[in-house]
Amino acid sequence: MTLGAVSAEGAKLDETDMVGVSFWLATAMMLASTVFFIMERNNVAAKWKTSMTVAALVTGVAWYHYTYMREHWAASYAEGAGESPLVMRYIDWLITVPLQVAEFYLILAAVGAATAMLFWRLFGASLVMLIAGFLGESGQAPEMPMLAIGVAAWLYIIYEVRAGDAKKGADTTSEGTQFAFKAMAIILTVGWAIYPIGYFLGTGEDANTDALNILYNIADVVNKTAFGLMVWYAATMDTKASSSEE
């Protein structure tokens, strides 16, 4: 099914389709978050506007893709068995996940505590994680080795954020920025752990497509929306602190 083959006028949502419900809820949350981040962008200092723009892009791009993913699922569910929108989901992740990882760099860059090399290391690790995941889930490579590679890349990102240059840079920032950075690191550690769990449940002969998609949808809402809210919190706290010093 191509992107152009589905629309908001497609298959109806079945009341027993909990996966479909999770797709619809995720779509609504992504749209609401995007509107909020765009409006709040005008209330933060200039140095934070790029970070707020990226937060809005993450949820905005996700909203666009979810409008198609939910219809893909509903249409296939109506035909007898829900089909996971694998390609659409990974296209979304290929755009939004590197943007999320870049937020760590942007937050530190906003207060002058980041280097370009940090950005490229985080960006590269996120691509390795995504490419390995897609190759494994699509059957183009062995599932478990690809899961191991993806998890290794994720653990490297966690290391950079919790113990590497990103952590060292965050320690020199304001209290509000440090709090937001730590909260984002928790989301990266705990929230992103949902993805390999979903991946694992969707592999093998007894693959649970329903559980995989529900977990992926929950993870996307938590990680994209909550992640953006932490950026917003850091921006507003730093803006207030700067205003009080003037």
Would you name each region that the model predicts?
Residues 3-30:
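Hydrophobic transmembrane alpha-helical segments in integral membrane proteins
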Residues 13-18, 80-94, 213-218:
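Short aromatic-rich membrane-water interface segments that cap or initiate transmembrane helices
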Residues 29, 51-71, 191-200:
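Hydrophobic alpha-helical transmembrane segments of multi-pass membrane proteins
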Residues 32-36, 103, 132, 153-175, ...:
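Alpha-helical transmembrane segments in multipass membrane proteins, preferentially the mid-helix core
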Residues 34-38, 70, 90-123, 130, ...:
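Internal transmembrane alpha-helix with an interfacial aromatic "cap," most often the third helix
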Residues 46-55, 114-120, 181-184:
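Membrane-interfacial loop-to-transmembrane alpha-helix junctions, especially the N-terminal start
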Residues 62-89, 131-140:
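Helix-loop junctions on the outward
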Residues 160-163, 183-246:
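C-terminal transmembrane-bundle signature of multipass membrane proteins
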